[in-house]
């Protein structure tokens, strides 16, 4: 997709997507809009069954809300967050999915269990629990606990509103991993198959070599983003994470929504994959980074292939 020069600010669009024309976005491109707002009024203004994919990472439970000192505990999730997810269920198309990236923090001597409670709460709301993906971090930050190892995984739970959720694994194929013996055998095969004798003596059969590209697993091995971060956001997931789910669960031109958008990583992935997007972030300190991230284009896009 051609990108505008870094000096050219993408124009503001009106009425995209349908249903929020009366709300002025803080920033927009030909594909999407950013709103600096609480996410509830944006969700309420959207028409029902208008979203193809919702992907988000809400604040971790019990942790300060980054710079403002507010804590997002279990009560916050039971009240505000569940109101958000109730609206998301209404706004999803019948084939749409909701992907929730979440990891409970440790509390004293035990791990929090809110991530598992959320699965049950969402099922009670009417969601179908489709899949759980694990985001594995090869180089996690060092731990600060005497009796625990480095925290190297987070969960991405996929939910839908009907059993007919769309799914495009062919967009996410990964190179097959063959051992040395398999690779040597593949080099000897003519036309990618060979004929071998049946053990029963009933003739011959063809044995086809395995494919070069295969479906990926539910283990997503991605480096986290930490350390030097010009946006000062403490929990920005890598752009490869939303990119994977956008490829897997949507087609070009469909609409992606993130109600807790942060610095706009979901928007950057959607923009470069040709999907329409709507991002909401209440903290302008974080959302201000999005125009530069969109304009950076290849520098960002190269990190999610």
Where are the model-predicted features located?
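Cysteine-dependent PTP/DSP-like catalytic domain, specifically the C-terminal lobe
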Residues: 285-305
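Core catalytic lobe of class I
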Residues: 1-289
């Amino acid at each position: 997709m051609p990108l505008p020069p870094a000096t050219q600010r993408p124009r503001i669009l009106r009425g995209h997507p349908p249903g929020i024309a009366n709300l002025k976005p803080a920033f927009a491109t030909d594909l999407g809009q950013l709103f600096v707002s609480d996410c509830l009024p944006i969700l309420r203004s959207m028409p029902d069954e208008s979203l193809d994919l919702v992907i988000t990472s809400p604040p971790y439970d019990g942790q300060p809300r980054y710079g403002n000192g507010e804590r997002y505990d279990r009560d916050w999730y039971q009240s505000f967050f569940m109101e958000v997810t109730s609206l998301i269920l209404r706004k999803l198309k019948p084939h749409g999915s909701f992907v929730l990236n979440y990891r409970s923090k440790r509390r004293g001597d035990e791990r929090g269990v809110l991530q598992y409670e959320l699965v049950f709460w969402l099922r009670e709301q009417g969601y179908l629990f489709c899949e759980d993906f694990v985001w594995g971090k090869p180089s996690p930050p060092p731990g600060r606990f005497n009796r625990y190892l480095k925290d190297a995984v987070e969960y991405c739970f996929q939910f839908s509103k009907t059993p007919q959720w769309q799914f495009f694994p062919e967009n996410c194929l990964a190179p097959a991993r063959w051992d040395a013996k398999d690779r040597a055998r593949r080099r000897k095969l003519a036309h990618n198959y060979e004929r071998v004798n049946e053990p029963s003596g009933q003739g011959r059969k063809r044995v086809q070599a395995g494919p070069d590209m295969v479906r990926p697993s539910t283990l997503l091995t991605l480096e986290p983003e930490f350390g030097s971060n010009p946006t000062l956001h403490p929990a920005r997931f890598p752009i490869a994470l939303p990119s994977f789910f956008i490829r897997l669960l949507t087609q070009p031109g469909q609409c992606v929504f993130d109600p807790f958008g942060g610095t706009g990583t979901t928007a950057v992935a959607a923009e470069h994959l040709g999907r329409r997007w709507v991002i909401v972030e209440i903290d302008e300190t974080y959302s201000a980074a999005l125009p530069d991230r969109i304009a950076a284009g290849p520098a960002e896009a190269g990190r999610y292939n």
